[in-house]
Amino acid sequence: MLREQIAASLEVAFSQQGFAEPSVAQLKTACDVSLRTLYKHFPSKEAMIVGALEYRHQRYLDFLLETSPEKGLASVTHIFNKLQQWLEEYAPHGCMSMNAMAAFPDNEFISQAVTQHKEQVRLLIGKQSLREDLATPLFLLHEGVSSAWPVLGEEAVASAQNMVTKLLKETV
C-alpha cells in the first residue's frame, strides 16, 4: 500500500515538474517519506519514473473504461471523449509516457514501461472497437490526439472522432 501511495505522489511530482528537474530530495519531500523509504521501494530515480509511469498506466486504463458503453463505435467514441477529459485534467502538456521517453531516450527500463503501456492501450482500443484488425489505425489516432493536444486542443479530438466514425463505419 505504501509503495502505491509513493508511486501516486511520484506521478503527481513528475507530471507537474517534468522528469529532469526534480531532484531525489525534492521527490522525497513530494512523497512525504524518508529517503530510506523512498529508496527501499524505488532504488533509483529511473525506478521512481517507472513506478510513476506504471501507476499512471493503470489509472489511465481504468479511466478510459469508466462508464464505458457497449463495445463498438460507442465505446471507441467514449474512449476519445475520456482522452480529451484526461488531457484537460491530467496531461495538458501531452502524454507523460512520451515525455519520459524524450527525457531518457536511452533508458531501457523507461522505454520498456512506455512500450508496454502503449501496446496495452492499442490492444484495449482494438478490443473495445470489436475490430481488432483496426487496433493500430485507431491507436494512431489516439496517439495523434495526445501529441497534437498542446497545439490544437479540442480540434484534435473532434478531427480524430470524425476519422474514427468513418473508419469503423466504412470498414464494416
Residue ranges and their predicted role:
Residues 83, 97, 101, 138, ...:
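Short alpha-helical scaffolding segments that buttress acidic/His motifs in well-ordered protein cores
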Residues 5, 9-47:
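Helix-turn-helix
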Residues 87-111:
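Amphipathic alpha-helical segments used for helix-helix packing
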Residues 51, 65-90:
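Hydrophobic alpha-helical connector segments
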Residues 110-115, 119, 128-172:
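Hydrophobic/aromatic-rich alpha-helical bundle segments in the mid-to-C-terminal region
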Residues 47-56:
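Alpha-helical DNA-contacting segments of helix-turn-helix folds
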